[in-house]
Amino acid sequence: MPPPEKPLGEPLDAPLDENELWLLSFYRTSEISGSLFFGKLARTLRPGPIQIDMTKHFADEAQHAWYWTECIRELGAQPMKLADAYQDQYASTAGMPANLMEVLAITQIFERRVINQYTRHAKAPGLKLPVARTLEKIMQDELWHIDWVKKALESLEPEYGRATIEETIERFRAADREVYARTMREHEERLRTLFGE
């Protein structure tokens, strides 16, 4: 059986440097954190479409953590143990979501950030083949995450009002910009090296 068509990337035997290992471990930690959060939430939701989609979302996040684990191992390393995930900073910046609508609003913003980051990473010079494959696999799910959350927020408009939902999304968008800027400053050297900036 011939090997699958290869996306752009370096040969499989290129080792991970410390910055690459950190970033892939950061992604993995974020996916684990998302899975745990959505899993707990899915257990508490009333039966219905949001509960079903939240359960699928939780399962996807767990699978993504596994994909990053496999990718790191394929590149001859072990995932780093990192204390915090990206989304852990949201609570201190924007406060804890107070209801399901706020959870979905912050999820919409976060998932868009993930897609943007993964798209940026997919264009990085010297992208390793296992990383390219992993990004490609995960981004398909991430697009669905954005779609289902958007539809779920629309379904909540009669309860919360479109204006309130839009204001909430904007509040979390501002918090995300702050968290992203802080993360970029904190890890600027690592990221500049990785993305050739």
For every predicted segment, state its role.
Residues 1-197:
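Non-heme di-metal
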